[in-house]
């Protein structure tokens, strides 16, 4: 039995998966388009093996859980970042499968999904913004089911997601920042807190910062790598966007602190000898091992609690940088440059190997406020 065929359409290849006849004698076929003949052939061969083994499921028999497994592994996983994949796995395993998984794919309705959103918010306590992430996943998964003709009508066309709530960023006042900088002095959080407060870095940029990115002689630091976390796995990659890759000016206070940290690192290398983890990262523990991003956030949160300081997350030191820049009268364009935001103005002209001094005023303005607040603390 043939079980299907491959037809070239332009530069793409369309596979017809033949499932034989259903109970009413009607022949059941499914179609899917692939970019290369190799991919199309591999998919058709896999279909043939399942048909021969008797493990192939008719499209009409697919449960939503089975579709999610196929969509995640074969369609979306090759297209997304590891951190996104980790989030999708969690949503599918912990929420979608338990609540909707047993429903036949072709029987899944807009009402089922709308009730699912209510369940997430009322029973599971998820925020509307988090539920919107579930909505986006469902839209992607069911659009794929529709395009591959597993469903004839997409229920997502009649589903209304919850209204997105605008997140109001929290940040420290100059006085609060001064107290934080005073209390963090001499602790293992001193360097990471100063870097985030004085430069406005993202957590991933902070954790991905290497000494090879730091030029103490010319007082610059180049932001071009990140280190993030998906579950227990740490992921090293480039910056978030093209405009996130940037070279920043190092104010005197931070430059001196980095020089001290470099000297301290040499002392630790001598003390720990062969067990020292010499990896070139700037933000490390005494034995040279880099801080895991989530652990660094946990340490920061605990430090604030232990010292009766207002609760913010580590990323909100970046918001503090933006707020203090604005308070210092720095033009918004220069603040965006320092933060590495993607805007039409900055994406047109990105300098990664030369220092763009348009942002220097922002960095120096925040440094002046922070230094003054620290002295008063």
State the predicted function of each range:
Residues 1-11:
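Short N-terminal "domain-start" leader segments
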Residues 9-111, 261-278, 371, 377:
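N-terminal DNA-binding module of tyrosine recombinases/phage integrases
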Residues 19, 30, 60-61, 72-155, ...:
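N-terminal core-binding DNA-recognition domain of tyrosine site-specific recombinases/integrases
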Residues 33, 208-214, 336-342, 352:
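A short, basic/aromatic helix-end/turn motif that makes direct DNA contacts
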Residues 124, 128, 182, 186-189, ...:
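Short, basic (Lys/Arg/His-rich) helix/loop patches that form interaction surfaces
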Residues 128, 132-134, 147, 151-153, ...:
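Basic, Lys/Arg- and aromatic-enriched nucleic-acid-binding interface segment
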Residues 163, 171, 227, 339-365:
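Catalytic-site neighborhood detector that most strongly recognizes the C-terminal catalytic loop/helix
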Residues 182, 218, 231-260, 264-267, ...:
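C-terminal secondary-structure termini that scaffold catalytic or DNA-interacting sites
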């Amino acid at each position: 039995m043939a079980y299907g065929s491959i037809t070239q359409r332009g530069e793409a290849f369309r596979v017809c998966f033949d499932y034989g006849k259903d109970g009413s004698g009607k022949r059941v076929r499914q179609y899917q388009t692939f970019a290369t003949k190799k991919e199309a052939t591999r998919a058709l061969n896999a279909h043939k093996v399942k048909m021969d083994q008797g493990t192939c499921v008719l499209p009409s028999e697919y449960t939503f859980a089975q579709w999610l497994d196929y969509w995640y592994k074969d369609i979306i996983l090759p297209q997304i970042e590891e951190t996104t994949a980790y989030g999708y796995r969690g949503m599918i395993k912990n929420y979608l499968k338990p609540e909707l998984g047993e429903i036949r794919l072709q029987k899944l309705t807009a009402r089922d999904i709308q009730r699912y959103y209510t369940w997430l918010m009322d029973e599971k306590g998820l925020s509307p913004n988090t539920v919107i992430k579930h909505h986006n996943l469902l839209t992607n998964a069911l659009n794929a089911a529709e395009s591959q003709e597993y469903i004839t009508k997409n229920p997502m066309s009649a589903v209304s997601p919850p209204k997105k709530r605008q997140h109001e960023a929290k940040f420290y006042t100059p006085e609060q920042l001064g107290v934080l900088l005073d209390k963090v002095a001499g602790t293992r959080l001193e360097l990471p807190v100063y870097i985030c407060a004085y430069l406005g870095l993202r957590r991933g940029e902070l954790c991905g910062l290497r000494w090879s990115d730091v030029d103490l002689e010319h007082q610059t630091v180049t932001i071009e790598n990140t280190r993030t976390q998906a579950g227990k796995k740490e992921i090293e990659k480039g910056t978030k966007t093209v405009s996130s890759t940037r070279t920043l000016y190092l104010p005197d206070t931070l430059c001196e602190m980095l020089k001290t940290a470099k000297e301290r690192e040499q002392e630790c290398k001598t003390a720990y000898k062969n067990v020292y983890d010499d990896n070139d990262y700037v933000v490390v523990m005494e034995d040279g091992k880099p801080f895991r991003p989530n652990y660094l956030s946990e340490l920061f949160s605990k430090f604030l609690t232990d010292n009766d300081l207002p609760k913010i997350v580590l990323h909100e030191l970046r918001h503090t940088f933006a707020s203090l820049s604005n308070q210092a009268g720095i033009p918004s364009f220069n603040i965006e440059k320092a933060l590495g935001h993607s805007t039409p103005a900055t994406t047109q002209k990105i300098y990664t190997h030369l220092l763009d001094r348009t942002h220097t005023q922002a960095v120096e303005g925040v440094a002046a406020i922070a230094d003054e607040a620290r002295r008063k603390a």
